[in-house]
């Protein structure tokens, strides 16, 4: 028999999932708490017990997305970049990545492709939240700057969160403005747009979802 704690967590998760669907389908502004409560099968008071308002629900969705995406990026950095530097197989100097052998370069390239696959799978799995985020960022409302929270994945007071670890490993490592701009506009934004428009593009173009994903991967790998 589920414990009270388990039931409480289950109810909270149901609220989050239903709210996510409403936000994605109707838009954040058009979504009403009483409609979320009706679909969940609870009264409004219970929703307010877990969340102060619908903004708090969206904040939770965005922060969870941010945290999970950060884990993927940090894991790749630790398992590949930092590991190769420590093993003497990679040296980063003046923005140039120097591998000690062609084999090392090839191994890193393959790891990078797997990382791209993981990132694409992640944004597609969370495309309903990303769709909300992208559309809300285009409005002149509270969440117009929400997408820029992801800049914190690129830098924190001028430094990338994982760049500190790289710098501690390789003192020649430097990060500049071009790196930040490239990662945001040619890294995150294409991924977010792909996820946000994935379903509608598949319907409009007649391309199957599997082929659409494969086509995007081929294009993304060239960037």
Language model region names:
Residues 1-10, 21, 81-85:
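N-terminal intrinsically disordered/low-complexity leader segments
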Residues 14, 18, 22-68, 79:
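Helix-turn-helix
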Residues 61-111:
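Amphipathic alpha-helical linker/stalk segments
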Residues 64, 132-136, 186, 190:
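Short acidic/histidine-centered micro-motifs embedded in hydrophobic/aromatic stretches
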Residues 64-68, 72-79, 122, 126, ...:
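Phosphate/oxyanion-binding loops and surfaces in catalytic or ligand/nucleic-acid-binding neighborhoods
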Residues 82, 86, 121, 125, ...:
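C-terminal peripheral helix-coil segments that are non-catalytic and often amphipathic
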Residues 104-107, 111, 115, 146, ...:
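Soluble or luminal CAZymes and related metallo-dependent hydrolases
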Residues 109-110, 114, 118-172, 181-182:
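Amphipathic alpha-helical packing segments from all-alpha helical-bundle domains
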């Amino acid at each position: 028999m589920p414990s009270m704690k388990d039931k409480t967590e289950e109810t909270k998760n149901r609220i989050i999932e239903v709210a996510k669907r409403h936000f994605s389908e109707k838009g954040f502004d058009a979504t009403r708490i009483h409609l979320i409560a009706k679909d969940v099968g609870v009264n409004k008071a219970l929703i307010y017990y877990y969340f102060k308002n619908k903004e708090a629900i969206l904040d939770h969705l965005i922060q969870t997305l941010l945290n999970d995406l950060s884990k993927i990026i940090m894991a790749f950095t630790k398992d590949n970049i930092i590991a190769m530097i420590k093993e003497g197989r990679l040296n980063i100097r003046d923005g140039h990545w120097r591998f000690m052998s062609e084999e090392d370069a090839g191994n890193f390239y393959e790891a990078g492709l797997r990382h791209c696959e993981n990132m694409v799978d992640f944004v597609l799995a969370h495309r309903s939240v990303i769709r909300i985020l992208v559309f809300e960022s285009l409005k002149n409302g509270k969440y117009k700057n929400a997408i820029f929270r992801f800049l914190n994945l690129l830098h924190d007071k001028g430094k990338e969160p994982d760049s500190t670890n790289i710098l501690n490993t390789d003192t020649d490592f430097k990060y500049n403005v071009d790196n930040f701009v490239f990662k945001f506009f040619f890294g995150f934004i294409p991924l977010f747009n792909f996820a946000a428009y994935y379903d509608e593009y598949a319907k409009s173009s007649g391309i199957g979802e599997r082929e659409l994903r494969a086509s995007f991967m081929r294009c993304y790998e060239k960037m």
